[in-house]
From Swiss-Prot:
It comes from Xylella fastidiosa (strain Temecula1 / ATCC 700964). Belongs to the bacterial ribosomal protein bL34 family. This is Large ribosomal subunit protein bL34. Residues 32-46 have a biased composition (Basic residues). Gene3D superfamilies: 1.10.287.3980. Coiled coil: none annotated. Disulfide bonds: none annotated. HAMAP family: Ribosomal_bL34 (MF_00391). Residues 1-46 are annotated as: Disordered. One of its GO terms (molecular function) is structural constituent of ribosome. One of its GO terms (biological process) is translation. Keywords: Ribonucleoprotein, Ribosomal protein. Residues 1-11 have a biased composition (Polar residues). One of its GO terms (cellular component) is ribosome.
Amino acid sequence: MATKRTYQPSNLKRKRDHGFRARMSTADGRKILARRRAKGRKRLSA
């Protein structure tokens, strides 16, 4: 019996957990976005 891979891609889960709205919904998430803006990231979130 082989063990399954841990990464099972799903766009819905990706957006719900790491999307812009998810980041904006918490204070810490907004800190993440602020850091990424300061760094000059082209993409702020998933």
